[in-house]
From Swiss-Prot:
Parts forming coiled coils: none
The VPS28 N-terminal domain, residue ranges: 13-120
Domain VPS28 C-terminal: 124-220
Assembly description: Component of the ESCRT-I complex (endosomal sorting complex required for transport I) which consists of TSG101, VPS28, a VPS37 protein (VPS37A to -D) and MVB12A or MVB12B in a 1:1:1:1 stoichiometry. Interacts with TSG101, VPS37B, VPS37C, MVB12A and MVB12B. Component of an ESCRT-I complex (endosomal sorting complex required for transport I) which consists of TSG101, VPS28, VPS37A and UBAP1 in a 1:1:1:1 stoichiometry. Interacts with VPS36; the interaction mediates the association with the ESCRT-II complex. Interacts with SNF8 and VPS25. Interacts with CEP55.
Principal location class: membrane
Protein's organism: Homo sapiens (Human)
Single Gene Ontology BP annotation: multivesicular body assembly
Protein name stated in the entry: Vacuolar protein sorting-associated protein 28 homolog
Amino acid sequence: MFHGIPATPGIGAPGNKPELYEEVKLYKNAREREKYDNMAELFAVVKTMQALEKAYIKDCVSPSEYTAACSRLLVQYKAAFRQVQGSEISSIDEFCRKFRLDCPLAMERIKEDRPITIKDDKGNLNRCIADVVSLFITVMDKLRLEIRAMDEIQPDLRELMETMHRMSHLPPDFEGRQTVSQWLQTLSGMSASDELDDSQVRQMLFDLESAYNAFNRFLHA
Protein backbone atom coordinates (compact mmCIF):
# COMPACT_ATOMS: atom_id res chain seq x y z
CA MET A 1 0.00 0.00 0.00
CA PHE A 2 1.29 3.47 -0.95
CA HIS A 3 4.31 1.91 -2.72
CA GLY A 4 6.37 4.31 -4.84
CA ILE A 5 5.43 7.42 -2.86
CA PRO A 6 8.67 9.13 -1.72
CA ALA A 7 8.97 9.98 1.93
CA THR A 8 8.73 13.70 2.58
CA PRO A 9 10.83 15.10 5.43
CA GLY A 10 8.80 16.76 8.15
CA ILE A 11 8.95 20.46 8.79
CA GLY A 12 12.35 21.37 10.19
CA ALA A 13 13.84 17.93 9.44
CA PRO A 14 17.44 17.96 8.18
CA GLY A 15 16.62 15.93 5.07
CA ASN A 16 19.71 15.35 2.92
CA LYS A 17 22.02 17.73 4.83
CA PRO A 18 24.65 15.53 6.48
CA GLU A 19 26.52 18.59 7.75
CA LEU A 20 23.71 19.09 10.27
CA TYR A 21 24.72 15.81 11.91
CA GLU A 22 28.35 16.82 12.31
CA GLU A 23 29.75 17.35 15.79
CA VAL A 24 30.05 21.00 16.76
CA LYS A 25 33.30 21.71 18.59
CA LEU A 26 33.74 24.62 20.96
CA TYR A 27 37.42 24.89 20.14
CA LYS A 28 39.58 24.97 17.00
CA ASN A 29 42.91 24.03 18.52
CA ALA A 30 44.59 22.75 21.69
CA ARG A 31 44.96 26.22 23.17
CA GLU A 32 41.25 26.96 22.84
CA ARG A 33 40.42 23.57 24.30
CA GLU A 34 42.60 24.29 27.32
CA LYS A 35 40.90 27.65 27.74
CA TYR A 36 37.45 26.07 27.86
CA ASP A 37 38.68 23.30 30.17
CA ASN A 38 40.05 25.92 32.56
CA MET A 39 36.77 27.84 32.54
CA ALA A 40 34.86 24.61 33.18
CA GLU A 41 37.08 23.86 36.19
CA LEU A 42 36.49 27.31 37.65
CA PHE A 43 32.75 26.99 37.05
CA ALA A 44 32.72 23.61 38.84
CA VAL A 45 34.68 24.91 41.84
CA VAL A 46 32.29 27.84 42.35
CA LYS A 47 29.22 25.59 42.01
CA THR A 48 30.72 23.09 44.48
CA MET A 49 31.44 25.86 46.97
CA GLN A 50 27.84 27.07 46.67
CA ALA A 51 26.58 23.54 47.37
CA LEU A 52 28.91 23.22 50.38
CA GLU A 53 27.65 26.50 51.85
CA LYS A 54 24.06 25.33 51.52
CA ALA A 55 24.93 21.98 53.11
CA TYR A 56 26.53 23.75 56.08
CA ILE A 57 23.53 26.04 56.52
CA LYS A 58 21.27 22.97 56.57
CA ASP A 59 23.56 21.33 59.17
CA CYS A 60 24.43 18.48 56.78
CA VAL A 61 28.17 18.73 57.53
CA SER A 62 30.02 19.33 60.79
CA PRO A 63 31.93 22.59 61.32
CA SER A 64 35.31 20.84 61.10
CA GLU A 65 34.36 18.96 57.90
CA TYR A 66 33.01 22.17 56.40
CA THR A 67 36.12 24.14 57.36
CA ALA A 68 38.46 21.61 55.75
CA ALA A 69 36.37 21.29 52.57
CA CYS A 70 35.89 25.04 52.18
CA SER A 71 39.59 25.72 52.75
CA ARG A 72 40.51 23.25 50.02
CA LEU A 73 37.97 24.77 47.62
CA LEU A 74 39.35 28.26 48.24
CA VAL A 75 42.84 27.05 47.35
CA GLN A 76 41.45 25.35 44.23
CA TYR A 77 39.51 28.49 43.31
CA LYS A 78 42.65 30.64 43.40
CA ALA A 79 44.51 28.20 41.18
CA ALA A 80 41.57 27.87 38.76
CA PHE A 81 40.97 31.61 38.51
CA ARG A 82 44.62 32.30 37.69
CA GLN A 83 44.20 30.02 34.67
CA VAL A 84 41.32 32.06 33.20
CA GLN A 85 42.21 35.57 34.31
CA GLY A 86 43.13 37.79 31.39
CA SER A 87 41.75 40.27 28.90
CA GLU A 88 38.45 38.40 28.53
CA ILE A 89 37.93 37.69 32.25
CA SER A 90 39.34 40.23 34.71
CA SER A 91 37.38 39.32 37.85
CA ILE A 92 35.27 36.51 39.29
CA ASP A 93 32.24 38.82 39.18
CA GLU A 94 32.73 39.24 35.45
CA PHE A 95 33.09 35.47 35.02
CA CYS A 96 29.82 34.86 36.88
CA ARG A 97 27.95 37.45 34.82
CA LYS A 98 29.29 36.10 31.54
CA PHE A 99 28.26 32.53 32.30
CA ARG A 100 25.12 33.36 34.32
CA LEU A 101 26.53 31.75 37.43
CA ASP A 102 24.28 32.63 40.37
CA CYS A 103 26.18 31.52 43.48
CA PRO A 104 25.91 34.31 46.09
CA LEU A 105 27.03 32.15 49.01
CA ALA A 106 30.15 31.02 47.18
CA MET A 107 30.93 34.60 46.13
CA GLU A 108 30.79 35.72 49.75
CA ARG A 109 33.28 33.02 50.75
CA ILE A 110 35.58 33.96 47.88
CA LYS A 111 35.52 37.66 48.78
CA GLU A 112 36.15 36.98 52.48
CA ASP A 113 38.78 34.37 51.54
CA ARG A 114 37.99 32.19 54.56
CA PRO A 115 35.40 29.64 55.67
CA ILE A 116 32.47 31.12 57.58
CA THR A 117 33.56 29.15 60.68
CA ILE A 118 36.80 31.10 61.00
CA LYS A 119 36.94 34.14 63.22
CA ASP A 120 39.63 36.80 63.20
CA ASP A 121 41.51 35.45 66.22
CA LYS A 122 44.57 33.38 65.33
CA GLY A 123 43.96 30.83 68.07
CA ASN A 124 40.63 29.73 66.70
CA LEU A 125 40.46 25.95 66.11
CA ASN A 126 38.82 26.34 62.73
CA ARG A 127 41.55 28.76 61.69
CA CYS A 128 44.11 26.05 62.50
CA ILE A 129 42.14 23.48 60.51
CA ALA A 130 41.97 25.80 57.51
CA ASP A 131 45.68 26.58 57.72
CA VAL A 132 46.64 22.90 57.97
CA VAL A 133 44.54 22.03 54.91
CA SER A 134 45.91 24.98 52.94
CA LEU A 135 49.53 24.18 53.81
CA PHE A 136 49.20 20.49 52.94
CA ILE A 137 47.80 21.43 49.53
CA THR A 138 50.37 24.19 48.99
CA VAL A 139 53.35 21.89 49.60
CA MET A 140 51.90 19.08 47.46
CA ASP A 141 51.08 21.49 44.63
CA LYS A 142 54.64 22.86 44.70
CA LEU A 143 56.06 19.36 44.38
CA ARG A 144 53.71 18.56 41.48
CA LEU A 145 54.87 21.76 39.77
CA GLU A 146 58.47 20.57 40.20
CA ILE A 147 59.29 23.21 42.80
CA ARG A 148 61.66 21.12 44.86
CA ALA A 149 64.45 23.35 46.25
CA MET A 150 64.97 23.12 50.01
CA ASP A 151 64.39 26.85 50.61
CA GLU A 152 61.10 26.72 48.66
CA ILE A 153 59.64 23.73 50.50
CA GLN A 154 60.92 23.93 54.07
CA PRO A 155 59.18 27.21 55.16
CA ASP A 156 55.70 25.89 54.31
CA LEU A 157 56.48 22.50 55.83
CA ARG A 158 57.74 24.12 59.04
CA GLU A 159 54.62 26.30 59.24
CA LEU A 160 52.50 23.17 58.74
CA MET A 161 54.25 21.50 61.66
CA GLU A 162 53.83 24.55 63.91
CA THR A 163 50.14 24.84 63.03
CA MET A 164 49.51 21.18 63.88
CA HIS A 165 51.26 21.74 67.23
CA ARG A 166 48.79 24.55 67.98
CA MET A 167 45.86 22.17 67.54
CA SER A 168 45.36 20.83 71.06
CA HIS A 169 42.64 18.48 69.79
CA LEU A 170 45.12 16.68 67.55
CA PRO A 171 46.51 13.51 69.25
CA PRO A 172 50.23 13.71 70.17
CA ASP A 173 50.88 10.52 68.19
CA PHE A 174 49.06 11.72 65.06
CA GLU A 175 50.87 10.15 62.10
CA GLY A 176 50.85 13.37 60.12
CA ARG A 177 53.10 15.03 62.69
CA GLN A 178 55.61 12.22 62.44
CA THR A 179 55.57 12.39 58.64
CA VAL A 180 56.14 16.14 58.51
CA SER A 181 58.79 15.95 61.23
CA GLN A 182 60.76 13.31 59.32
CA TRP A 183 60.75 15.37 56.13
CA LEU A 184 61.80 18.49 58.04
CA GLN A 185 64.78 16.54 59.33
CA THR A 186 65.63 15.48 55.79
CA LEU A 187 65.43 19.06 54.52
CA SER A 188 67.46 20.43 57.44
CA GLY A 189 70.40 18.37 56.22
CA MET A 190 70.33 20.10 52.83
CA SER A 191 71.66 23.48 51.76
CA ALA A 192 69.21 26.15 50.57
CA SER A 193 69.81 25.53 46.87
CA ASP A 194 69.75 21.72 47.10
CA GLU A 195 66.77 20.05 45.41
CA LEU A 196 64.87 16.87 46.15
CA ASP A 197 65.47 14.19 43.52
CA ASP A 198 62.65 12.44 41.62
CA SER A 199 62.50 9.56 44.07
CA GLN A 200 62.30 11.88 47.08
CA VAL A 201 59.59 13.99 45.45
CA ARG A 202 57.51 10.91 44.70
CA GLN A 203 57.92 9.60 48.26
CA MET A 204 57.20 12.97 49.83
CA LEU A 205 54.02 13.37 47.79
CA PHE A 206 52.90 9.90 48.85
CA ASP A 207 53.68 10.60 52.53
CA LEU A 208 51.97 14.00 52.55
CA GLU A 209 48.90 12.67 50.74
CA SER A 210 48.64 9.89 53.34
CA ALA A 211 49.07 12.40 56.18
CA TYR A 212 46.47 14.71 54.65
CA ASN A 213 43.98 11.85 54.35
CA ALA A 214 44.68 10.89 57.97
CA PHE A 215 43.97 14.49 59.00
CA ASN A 216 40.64 14.39 57.19
CA ARG A 217 39.76 11.09 58.86
CA PHE A 218 40.51 12.69 62.23
CA LEU A 219 38.14 15.57 61.42
CA HIS A 220 35.38 13.17 60.39
CA ALA A 221 35.74 10.94 63.46
